[in-house]
Every structure is written in C-alpha cells, then in structure tokens.
C-alpha cells in the first residue's frame, strides 16, 4: 500500500529534481533563479527518484510542437526499475498556464504503447503544444517502489501573445458545457494545513447526473494548483459511502469504483499554505471528459 506521507510531502513542495534540458529559461517554484541551457536544477526535495526532462526543440516557443522526454532515475542515478502503474498509466503529466486558461492531463500511453525498452530505460515521451507565451506548471505524478510521488517545475514559454492575470471568479456554482456543477465545502472558510472536504454536485437539464463513469480508475481526477504556481497537488474523488482503504483518494490505493455514480463526488484536500488555488476537476460522462474549474481562497 502506498505511503500517505510521501504523497503529501511531494504535493506540498517539490520541484522536478535533476535536469531540465531546455534553452528556454525556467524557474524552480522554490528557487526563483533562471536555469538557461543545459543547467542542472537545484534539488528541493532529495527524497525519492530524480525526474529529468528534455525538450525537443530545446527552445520552447508558443504554438510549436514540443517533444518532452521524461526520465526517472533512482537514488544511484540509474533508471528506476520499480515503477508501478498508477490509475491505469505509467505516469501522469499535468500542464497548466499561470492564468489558468490552459489545462492538459496527458500520458505517454496517449502517444503510443509503453514498450519494455522504455520501462528498462525508465524514459517516456509525451508531446505538447504550449498555446501561448508565459509561465506554465508541469506536474508529474508517478509511483515507484509502492510509493507515490508528485513533482513539478515551472517553464517559461516564449511567444508574441503573453498571458494575462487569472480571472478572480470565486463563484461556487458554474456551468461547464451542458452541465451545472456546484462546489460545496464543509466549512465556509477553507483553512491551510487541515484536511478540507469538498463536495461536487453535477446536474444536466435540471436533473441530477447519476450515471457518471470512472475515469482512469477514479471517480474524479483533481489538480489543485496555487495562483503563484508554488504548490501542485493531484487528488482523486470519492463517491459518498464508497469504502476506501487508501489515502482519501490520493494517488494509487485499494478501492472499488462503481460503474455508475453521481450526482455527488467528494474530494479531500490539504492546502499546504494560505492563498488562492485553482481546482481543475476531470470526470467522465457518456464517454466524454468534463473539465471543471473552481477558484478558492484558503486562509
């Protein structure tokens, strides 16, 4: 069973450890220094495997295809040989823009089969087009030796159309396509450092949606990102009354996801510090992914 504390530690504060091989300057979330060219990133959290990224082309430019190679190394600097499938994928890559208008959740499997050679090298490829200039957080979730890890970096993308500031919309009732979604909290004030329970309610055409479907072996995938891009948390939802033997939906655990559920999905989050956070939620209905976004203030 996965170690709960490992997941929490890395979700609270972890930059990508190792190298980011890109000519475009990048800034570690906890070290606001640029690292142009082939420069080694300072290690913020030495625990666990080291994640190394390389981009092709090296200069990241808005609107152009980018091949991102992700390598995972053990403490000896060798390819990590004990990676574990987590929520149906070898690893999860979350990309979000600083203004929160861009969000992607992708996997190596989206671009082809994961081969034995890839596993042996612990090296995987994803492709992405950053749509506009500015700062993006790139989060990577994976499991090794039965422990879950979340690491991230901030990348700066060059281009002519820079992004603006996030729109501060704190409404708890929103419409996403044909779906009306509400977000409720046990406490009106979301507190930092404590487990906060949030509840999503889904309806369509005035009727509760009771036939939501599992998405990557979870009721919901939630990416919680602070407005300063200083925190990245990846959590998973729970159906009220569903028995969980794991970590409140966090990462990989032993739980049974019903074939159909709704209209409520619960989400437990520990916000590491005060500030503003965007919560991106992904659920599946009738074969399609519904992306929700809620901005919350944490005191």
Locate the predicted segments by residue.
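Bacterial N-terminal signal peptides that target proteins for export
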Residues: 2-14
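Intrinsically disordered, low-complexity terminal tails/loops enriched in metal-binding residues
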Residues: 18, 25-299
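Bacterial N-terminal signal peptides
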Residues: 11-23
């Amino acid at each position: 069973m996965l170690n709960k504390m490992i997941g929490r530690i890395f979700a609270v504060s972890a930059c990508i450890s190792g190298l980011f091989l890109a000519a475009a300057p990048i800034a570690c979330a906890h070290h606001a220094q640029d690292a142009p060219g082939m420069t080694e990133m300072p290690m913020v959290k030495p625990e666990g495997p080291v994640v190394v990224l390389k981009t092709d082309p090296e200069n990241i430019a808005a609107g152009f295809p980018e091949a991102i190679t992700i390598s995972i190394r053990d403490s000896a600097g060798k390819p990590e040989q004990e990676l574990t499938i987590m929520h149906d994928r070898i690893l999860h890559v979350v990309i979000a823009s600083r203004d929160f208008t861009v969000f992607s959740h992708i996997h190596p499997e989206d671009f082809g089969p994961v081969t034995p050679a890839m596993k042996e090298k612990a090296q995987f490829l994803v492709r992405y087009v950053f749509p506009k200039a500015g700062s993006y957080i790139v989060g990577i979730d994976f499991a090794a030796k039965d422990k879950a890890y979340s690491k991230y970096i901030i990348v700066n993308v060059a281009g002519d159309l820079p992004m603006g500031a996030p729109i501060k919309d704190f409404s708890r009732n929103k419409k996403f396509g044909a779906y009306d979604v509400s977000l409720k909290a046990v406490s009106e004030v979301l507190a930092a450092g404590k487990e906060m329970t949030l509840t999503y309610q889904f309806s369509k055409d005035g009727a509760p949606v009771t036939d939501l479907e599992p998405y990557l072996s979870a009721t919901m995938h939630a990416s919680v990102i602070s407005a300063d891009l200083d925190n990245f948390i990846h959590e998973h939802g729970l159906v009220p009354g569903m028995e969980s033997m794991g970590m409140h939906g966090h990462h990989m655990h032993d739980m049974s996801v019903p074939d159909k559920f709704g209209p409520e999905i619960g989400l437990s989050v520990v916000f590491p510090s005060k500030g503003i956070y965007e919560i991106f939620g992904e659920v599946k209905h009738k074969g399609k992914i519904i992306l929700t976004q809620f901005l919350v203030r944490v005191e």
